[in-house]
Amino acid sequence: VGSINDAREEIINLCKIKKIHQIPIVDNKGNLIGIEVLNELISNKKKSNKVILMVGGLGTRLHPLTEKTPKPMLEVGKKPILLTIVEKFAEYGYSDIVMCVNHKADIIRDYFGDGAKFGVNIEYVLEDKRMGTAGALSLINEKITEPFFVMNGDLLTNVNFQHLHDFHTSNLSMATMCVRDYDFEIPYGVVNIKNTKILSIDEKPLHKFFVNAGIYIFDPEVLQFIPKDQFYDMPTLFNKLINENLKIISFPIREYWIDIGRTEELEKANNEFNKEF
């Protein structure tokens, strides 16, 4: 049995070790979400689901590095962050890519072109103003008929995109958000008080949360909830879907993931790249 958190290469190796041609994949609760076929994993058959990459950010926190270079084009592991993202999707057969560009769009277009030299097809949507993490989706003219991925262009991850897709579809979800564990320790003793009475004292309590990992998969029907030609971010979209009583779920990421928003994360990603990729 394979896990939803196993990478493609791990599943291939497991099939070879066990000398099997098919392997069931289960989620973290042991529920069956799909079956992987060894021949399909090795052949890397191309899939028709679109991948929409949000790459128009200003990268303000990474100045001066982003004064001449858009953040997704900063190098990690001696190649642009965005190239690694494209390669990871292509590894799972997702080669139909749309890049939503704004800040220094020409640099991204000049590097990737139509994507042919990278084995993918790339189209571009130009934001002529800031549209937010969801607003740019309203600019896509082509009719989308299948579940599609959306990902921020400043992330590096080893998430299994095929398992994310299967998890989304098997749960009949309208929208699925990838989430990460985040722990926060308060460095003091926290005093719980009612009026002036001390009820309890917790010494340096550890709070655990799930945070948005910046990777999503949506059913096409979600697009009707995004207003045209205006700023609209992902939290607003998800809250709208919640208010509409639509099924939206989370997909916990256990694999490697890093958000490269500051110089500290950029340095960390460079130090870890060869080990993780």
Regions found by a protein language model. Name each.
Residues N171-D181:
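A short, conserved acidic/glycine-rich loop-to-beta-strand motif
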Residues V1-I20, V26-D27:
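The conserved cystathionine-beta-synthase
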Residues E36, H103, M151, I193, ...:
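A conserved hydrophobic position in a structured secondary element of the catalytic/binding core
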Residues L58, D154-L155:
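Active-site metal-binding loops of divalent metal-dependent hydrolases
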Residues I20-P24, N31-K45:
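Short beta->alpha transition motifs characteristic of CBS
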Residues K79-N152, N158, H163, K228:
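Conserved N-terminal catalytic core of the sugar/cofactor nucleotidyltransferase
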